[in-house]
């Protein structure tokens, strides 16, 4: 999955893609964010980048037929994004356009168009306001929905999180305790045994299995917790 954006939507594109690895334990390559002007454009304006069709085309070289390219623009017209869409078409890659202008070129060129018509901005032309907020919500829905479909959650729990700091370790303990219906101390003890693998700890506690056997059972079910816990049931 590739998020590509013009200058004004740069922060949301990078932020959303960078949150996927710690939240869902996916590879950084699974959801990538690219912006007109590259990494320099995260903090500084790179003038002319969003008007460069060839730059968008070359930046999208990472795309293949197995990907989905999501292009984001309030106006729906940056040439940079037209380059991304052209590259996607050339490699038979599916495309989604997120825009706030139903008459823009993105609405014409993208395979699936999500258009949030938010009306005039409080400050005319400042698309970081209503347009940016609406597009950020849409982007969150897309990535979160995709992660749910691929088994990265159980009910409303982020059971694939990476417990890399104290806040996330505390969250992991609470998730394991609640799903496995055990005390926080039992949840912590099991998490310590399995290197903070939340799904492994849940399986070990709920199914009374050892750590390695729990990992094996998860692998048999493609790493999807709900398939294992509800084996034989409709999920």
Which residues are covered by each model-predicted region?
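Single conserved hydrophobic/aromatic residue that forms the stacking wall/gate
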Residues: 1-10, 14
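Short, flexible active-site loop motifs that bind/organize anionic cofactors or intermediates
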Residues: 3, 46, 71, 177, ...
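Conserved RecA-like P-loop NTPase ATPase core
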Residues: 7, 70, 214
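Glycine-rich phosphate-binding loops that contact phosphosugars or nucleotide phosphates
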Residues: 11-137, 146-150
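Short, amphipathic alpha-helical interaction segments embedded in low-complexity terminal/linker regions
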Residues: 65, 146-235
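Alpha-helix N-cap/loop-to-helix boundary motif
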Residues: 126-134, 138, 157-164, 168
């Amino acid at each position: 999955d590739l998020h590509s954006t013009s200058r004004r939507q740069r922060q949301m594109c990078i932020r959303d893609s960078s949150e996927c690895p710690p939240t869902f334990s996916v590879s950084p390559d699974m959801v990538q964010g690219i912006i007109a002007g590259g990494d320099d454009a995260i903090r500084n304006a790179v003038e002319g980048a969003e008007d460069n069709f060839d730059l968008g085309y070359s930046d999208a070289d990472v795309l293949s037929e197995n990907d989905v390219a999501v292009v984001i623009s309030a106006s729906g017209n940056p040439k940079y994004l037209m380059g991304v869409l052209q590259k996607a078409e050339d490699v038979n890659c599916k495309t989604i356009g997120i825009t706030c202008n139903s008459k823009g070129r993105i609405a014409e060129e993208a395979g699936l168009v999500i258009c949030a018509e938010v009306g005039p901005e409080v400050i005319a032309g400042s698309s970081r306001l209503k347009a940016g907020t609406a597009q950020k919500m849409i982007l969150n829905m897309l990535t979160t929905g995709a992660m749910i479909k691929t088994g990265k959650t159980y009910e409303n729990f982020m059971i694939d999180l990476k417990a890399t700091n104290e806040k996330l370790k505390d969250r992991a303990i609470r998730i394991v305790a609640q799903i496995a219906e055990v005390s926080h101390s039992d949840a912590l003890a099991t998490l310590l045994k399995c290197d903070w693998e939340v799904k492994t700890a849940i399986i070990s506690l709920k199914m009374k299995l050892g750590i390695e056997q729990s990992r094996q059972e998860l692998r048999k079910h493609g790493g999807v917790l709900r398939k294992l816990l509800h084996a034989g049931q409709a999920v």
